[in-house]
Amino acid sequence: KGKRKPRSIGEIVKRESIRPKHGALLFRLTNYFKSKNILQIGTTMGLSTLYLTSYATGLRCIALENVPEFATIARQAFAKEGRNPIDLRIGNYKDLLPQALNDINSLDFVFFNTLYEQHNNLWLFNECMKYAHNDTVFVFEGIKASRKMRELWEEICACPEVTVTLDLYSLGIVLFNKKLHKRDYIVYF
């Protein structure tokens, strides 16, 4: 009693991975916007990365992960699916992000799977925003998971560069298209 039982990889994957309907949405978004330069911050063992990159070949994806054990599982998943061109980088996000942004140069799609990085999220958003263009899409996971994440989402919605936000309760989608009027939508998903 009181001892923690070690969890199996299957239990960890089930708890930490993206839900299938959210993964399908990521696939549809990257497909619809024809994203060629994708950045993922936090891989959740690679499943969300596979959703992001499965719509086409010839795209560039840099995935950042700060948990080495998750990165090992992600790398195995990429190899199993034949997705070796995914550039997986392991380490602290604050150290990895500047070089990743410099390498990718222009962001088409960014998936922030950074629920456990709440203290860095605003910095990550602001750094990525410097490389955003009119057709860039940002997706945040866990926007209602905690008070800090809700506050972050409110700050993102208030950002003047952001034109449209979609609050899907557990996911948040951010658009920067200057042709669109500033709107914040709440959508049941």
Placement of each model-derived feature along the sequence:
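A short alpha-helical cap/connector motif
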Residues: 1-111, 115-139, 143-189
